[in-house]
Design a protein with these regions (language model features):
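A conserved beta-strand element that flanks and buttresses the S-adenosyl-L-methionine
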Residues: 180
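A short glycine-rich, Lys/Arg-flanked "PGG" loop and its adjoining helix->strand segment in the class I
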Residues: 192-207
Length: 259
């Protein structure tokens, strides 16, 4: 299957970027797709007393690597700025909690996992279904305020960012036969470190299930509002399969989930 043709913005042909290096394949060939200028952080809500103060803004530009076709933003905001005191609780959404319950039931039936680890486990919205079934589990959640809520619900949770180094530490204790990562993979700026961590933490016959927005749908539906600093990457299978292959993993199934 030939690679997709470069996308062009409404302003005309895309601009080749200088000083670009793909975060996946390390190629130095990137085209600018969309430049939204400098924007404030999407979830950085201000207190009333701060409204008169200048709000921090960061460049927001979307580019595509012309070697591996991975869509990515060009300028990173440090994850500690974005996630250490996060304001989004997954349990606030009835649709999302229903989706989580259905997924948990399906995974228990299909895989019968003995140990489940969820990356970016938030407030325990998903792991609670495994806890209620007495399945050994661990949540990894970088936001202490949210991890505290999960622990109060009885969900075993570690406050940390997921990295290969952390995966090595956890795997030495017990590898996971099921790793879940919903709406976090696109947030991890070091994609190779993240995937290497999956490989390290998985048991020999283990599975990782990743859920994330699909770049094809984003483009087809003009969902430009999903482009913001938290979302470093915008994935297609074309761009993802080489990443997993690089770390001795492979895609065995891909599904679209209506939300």
């Amino acid at each position: 299957m030939p690679p997709p043709k470069p996308v062009h913005s409404l302003r005309g042909p895309n601009k080749m970027l200088e000083n670009f290096q793909c975060r996946s394949c390390a190629a130095c060939s990137g085209e600018l797709i969309l430049d939204l200028g400098e924007q404030p952080l999407a979830n950085n809500l201000l207190a009333p007393e701060d409204l008169a103060q200048p709000e921090p803004r960061f460049p927001l530009r979307l580019a595509v690597c012309t070697e591996c076709w991975l869509l990515q933003i060009t300028d990173l905001v440090p994850p500690v700025e974005l996630f250490s005191n996060y304001i989004y609780f997954s349990s606030y959404s009835d649709a999302w909690t229903q989706h989580a319950a259905e997924c948990a039931a399906r995974y228990r039936d299909e895989f019968a996992p003995n140990y489940v680890i969820e990356i970016a486990s938030n407030d325990g919205y998903l792991l609670r279904h495994f806890a209620e079934a007495n399945t050994p589990h661990l949540g990894i959640e970088p936001a202490e305020n949210i991890a505290t809520v999960a622990r109060e619900k009885g969900i075993k949770t570690r406050t940390d960012f997921f990295t290969e180094k952390l995966a090595q530490e956890l795997a030495a204790e017990k590898p996971a036969d099921l790793i879940l990562a919903n709406n976090v993979f696109a947030h991890a700026p070091d994609i190779n470190d993240f995937v290497a961590g999956l490989k390290t933490l998985l048991a020999p016959e283990g599975r990782a299930i990743l859920e994330f927005p699909h770049a094809v749908e984003m483009i087809a539906q003009d969902e430009f509002d999903t482009i913001y600093h938290e979302h470093v990457f915008y994935f297609t299978l074309t761009a993802l399969e080489p990443v997993f292959a690089r770390h001795a993993l492979r895609v065995t199934r891909a599904e679209r989930t209506p939300m």
